[in-house]
A protein has these predicted regions:
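A recurrent flexible, glycine/aromatic-enriched loop bordering the glycosyltransferase active site
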Residues: 156, 168-170, 177-199, 221-223, ...
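Conserved donor nucleotide-binding strand/loop of the catalytic core
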Residues: 71-106
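A conserved acidic beta->alpha catalytic loop
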Residues: 44, 59-69, 88, 118-121
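Short, acidic, metal-binding catalytic loop of nucleotide-sugar glycosyltransferases
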Residues: 43-52
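Non-catalytic, C-terminal membrane-associated alpha-helical segments of glycosyltransferases
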Residues: 279-361
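Short beta-strand-to-loop acidic/aromatic patch adjacent to the donor-nucleotide binding site
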Residues: 108-119
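A short, conserved alpha-helix in the catalytic core of glycosyltransferases
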Residues: 190-241
Length: 361
């Protein structure tokens, strides 16, 4: 969410005064100096085929003209547009948790998390609500949308997130043709990308909120991992399409802040969600994954930051609350292990396709 981290978690200047009576979905948009994206993002939301939603923008102490623009935007429709202004940058996790808590208090069926550097298609919210309604038993925790690249909408940006035995996260379909049949089929995924994902609000009471120790990066993998440990599912919903710029807040694919936090959070993710036996079984591929990443970031000029992040994660891991690992059935751990193996193989194949395509020119 930003290039500065703070330990403050619940400081804000203005509570939105929402009184939900018939709206089903609360759209939560964290913002940090994202004025260049906000007009297009809000314009797309105003063209939705359903109107049973409200929009809450949570600003993480932006500078510049963001606040002036947001006040004007909110005043145009105060019943359905809400604004919460933080005095400090709470990161992605802290900001969206404020929205989720309000959604729980106000009785919204669904919480839609949306990055400010997105443009949703007109039937986006309708498609997600419709799919959630097809799950009357409430076993679907989250829906990951079909994210395509803003500069080339025919190319996939994210079709749900995966997690591997190497301790790496990757995006399904990244860079592939969005029209391929495989990306137009619903499927179970390991995690929803929280840049454009709908969550069943009530299940946060069981699964827990986003971990604010993460601040930003891998927090969506963490909450989806927990949901699976507790027996819930995460699905990829191809009918909900959104265009995405990518790295709109952090500003680049790799930078010192992002590399350090991602490294630290990768340690947090394992510590919180894998029991000791599972860590022992997977120790070799995990060590290999950390080594390869260290060498990769050395070449990129961020080797020191990656190592510092890993060490910080190891040193501070006990500050975190683990998932309720003792309550998870053994067969569920086996199921997750098999998925990690499958996703590791998929990652290798995806990488192979990418380099084969490059070689062919």
């Amino acid at each position: 969410m930003s290039t500065s981290e703070t330990t403050t978690t619940h400081t804000y200047r203005k509570e939105p005064t929402m009184r939900n009576s018939h709206y089903r979905t609360l759209v939560v948009i964290p913002n940090y100096n994202g004025l260049r994206f906000l007009p297009d993002c809000m314009e797309a939301l105003s063209r939705q085929t359903v109107t049973d939603f409200t929009v809450l923008v949570i600003d993480n102490a932006s500078g510049g003209d963001d606040i002036t623009w947001l006040h004007t935007w909110q005043a145009e429709d105060p019943a359905r547009r809400q604004l919460l202004l933080n005095d400090a940058n709470l990161g992605f996790s802290g900001a969206v948790n404020q929205g989720i808590r309000l959604a729980m208090e106000e009785g919204y069926n669904f919480t839609l998390l949306l990055n400010n550097d997105t443009k949703v298609r007109p039937d986006f919210i309708e498609a997600l609500e419709k799919r959630m309604d097809q799950d009357p038993k409430g076993r679907v925790f989250a829906l990951s949308s079909k994210m395509v690249k803003m500069h080339d909408p025919h190319e996939i940006d994210d079709a749900g997130d995966a997690y591997t035995l190497l301790g790496w996260q990757f995006q399904h379909g990244l860079g592939e043709c969005a029209e391929k049949p495989v990306w137009n089929r619903e499927t179970v995924v390991f995690s929803a990308c929280a840049g454009a994902a709908m969550y069943r609000t009530a299940l946060f009471g069981t699964v827990g909120l986003f971990d604010e120790h993460h601040f930003a990066y891998l927090e969506d993998i963490d909450v989806s991992y927990r949901a699976q440990l507790y027996g819930y599912r995460v699905l990829y919903c191809p009918t909900a399409v959104v265009e995405h710029v990518g790295s709109g807040t952090s500003g680049s694919k790799y930078n010192a802040f992002k590399v350090r936090l991602s490294a630290r959070n990768s340690v947090y993710l394992l510590y919180k969600n894998m029991p000791a036996l599972m860590l022992l079984v997977n120790v070799l591929p995990l060590l290999l994954g950390f080594l390869v990443k260290q060498l990769f970031f050395l070449r990129k000029g961020f080797g020191k930051e990656y190592a510092a992040g890993l060490l910080e994660g190891i040193r501070t891991r006990k500050q975190l609350e683990k998932a309720k690992l003792k309550e998870v059935p053994c067969l569920r751990y086996l199921s997750i292990e098999l998925r990690l193996i499958d996703q590791t193989l998929e990652y290798v194949l995806q990488l192979s396709r990418k380099y084969t395509a490059k070689a062919r020119g």
